[in-house]
Amino acid sequence: MTRGLELLIAQTILQGFDAQYGRFLEVTSGAQQRFEQADWHAVQQAMKQRIHLYDHHVGLVVEQLRCITEGKSTDVDFLLRVKQQYTQLLPDYPRFEIAESFFNSVYCRLFDHRSLTPERLFIFSSQPERPFRTLPRPLAKDFFPERGWSHLLGKVLSDLPLRLAWQNKARDIGYIIASLQEALGEELLATCHLQVANELFYRNKAAWLVGKLVMPMATLPFLLPIHRSDEGELFVDTCLTTHAEASIVFGFARSYFMVYAPLPGALVEWLREILPGKTTAELYMAIGCQKHAKTESYREYLHYITRCDEQFIEAPGIRGMVMLVFTLPGFDRVFKVIKDRFAPQKEVTAAHVRACYQLVKEHDRVGRMADTQEFENFVLDKRQIAPGLLALLQAEAGNKLTDLGDRIVISHLYIERRMVPLNLWLEQVNGQALRDAVEEYGNAIRQLAAANIFPGDMLFKNFGVTRHGRVVFYDYDEICYMTEVNFRQIPPPRYPEDELASEPWYSVSPGDVFPEEFRHWLCADPRIGPLFEEMHADLLRADYWRELQTRIKNGHVEDVYAYRRKQRFSVRYGADSRPDKVFTPPSGRVRRSA
């Protein structure tokens, strides 16, 4: 093969990435129109479409390269020269970091995830020190309260690109000021100014204004979820100003934002200040660059594994019937491998399990299903695997292992954020913490169901608790769409003996679910049962689930809030939330700073 071929291949890959990201931005740019037109089904379709774009364009490039090389095999030296040529194209390229991930994806598709070495791939960035702070145009605009906070906020809201009328802008400004006063106090607020991102962040049925509350000694998040009323008018639903609240909004269990980001690396750096607890991978994930997030996630893993003296161990909790789960004690992720054989009661296949994980990737996760990264041919050093875990892997997933002497290769696994299994959490807490956990658990089931997801296996062990106390579902092998389930009420027994029989006295078909039976395992614990019955008794009735199904089949898309209901302005300020009401903060207008 000629020397010029390496450059042609490198240019072809980069042009393929340009095409992919151009389509990514095109789909993203439609978010405003979808929001304004309340086309919520189009929102869901666009989310799936944008996820599929990446693999589609990788496939197109792979076919081009096979034509260019006429299907001939390539030697190691040739591949190294291709990477060198590609690297030389990147110093002036604005999205170099994601272009590196795209190169990796093309390589993996061409060579079936074999020979994944730093020499052939961008395992590490070619430009780790390249800053994103020098930009052709600012990512955000500063607003100062020289004429008071009412005027400042009026300017912020008026500058938004949304073309709908406001339901009551003066009322919402009053709410925001009252919320800021409660959070900071008037004196501190008077020393602050706002920095607001130029682009809105769209997700579900909200357009999020994302900003920074800049104080003399610190910077806080400033997040406003803007909603559209049924009458087509805009209103602000709440104001969030803590790092914990912002972390939940940008959480790993939520769908990706639609935010127009020609320079995603710069946006990630800008967000980092208000999301200090988020890793680089999580920030790229939040803005929809999920494939590059996978690259960053792997880099974070390598950074940890090369500096720790820990061994992989089986993850705490009840051992699963489908997945073998392991972790590093100090690492915040778990590794999940599909077993070779499932427990007899699990009538699913490995292909079905993988399809379920893909469904979760593409579906609206409503803050209640953990996102995952999928890896092939994942290499582990044997000396970093506890003997008990290694024996378990060989026994339960031996068909997915390749022994390389001092290392093993796992042909397929998922990496997911680690949480405390809910069953362990419930054993450890009491009082209000127990009540909160039971409430969260029921709310998770409700919100999943409203999003057309039936969890299937709702045992506590299949849910986890995040560091913010939220309950998240993470066992996907039995999930299905709500519309595929036949919810039934158990018919009354024909004779007294029926209730004592080992077999049911009624017919059961595939897809039948009897919510009354949930009580047997959800309410068996005397500490938990009364709380569940108090807060979530309707989940034990078939008619509750059938009513939800009817709403879904009629096209209803439920509102999803990334904050508690009590934080909504309509709840906090109650009677003052009428559309025609002008709300005045308790202490009047915030005074201007000197």
From Swiss-Prot:
Catalytic activity: L-seryl-[isocitrate dehydrogenase] + ATP = O-phospho-L-seryl-[isocitrate dehydrogenase] + ADP + H(+)
EC number(s) per entry: 2.7.11.5, 3.1.3.-
Any one GO biological process: glyoxylate cycle
Alphabetized UniProt keyword annotations: ATP-binding, Cytoplasm, Glyoxylate bypass, Hydrolase, Kinase, Nucleotide-binding, Protein phosphatase, Serine/threonine-protein kinase, Transferase, Tricarboxylic acid cycle
Disulfide bridge positions per record: none
Transport listed as a keyword: no
Binding-site residues, ATP: A315, P316, G317, I318, R319, G320, M321, K336
Subcellular location per the Swiss-Prot or TrEMBL entry: Cytoplasm
Gene Ontology cellular-component terms listed: cytoplasm
Predominant place of localization: cytoplasm
GO molecular function annotation: [isocitrate dehydrogenase (NADP+)] kinase activity; AMP binding; ATP binding; phosphoprotein phosphatase activity; protein serine/threonine kinase activity
Catalytic residues in the record: D371
Signal peptide: none
Free-text function comment from the UniProt entry: Bifunctional enzyme which can phosphorylate or dephosphorylate isocitrate dehydrogenase (IDH) on a specific serine residue. This is a regulatory mechanism which enables bacteria to bypass the Krebs cycle via the glyoxylate shunt in response to the source of carbon. When bacteria are grown on glucose, IDH is fully active and unphosphorylated, but when grown on acetate or ethanol, the activity of IDH declines drastically concomitant with its phosphorylation.
Family, as annotated: Belongs to the AceK family.
Name assigned to this protein: Isocitrate dehydrogenase kinase/phosphatase
Source species of the chain: Klebsiella pneumoniae (strain 342)
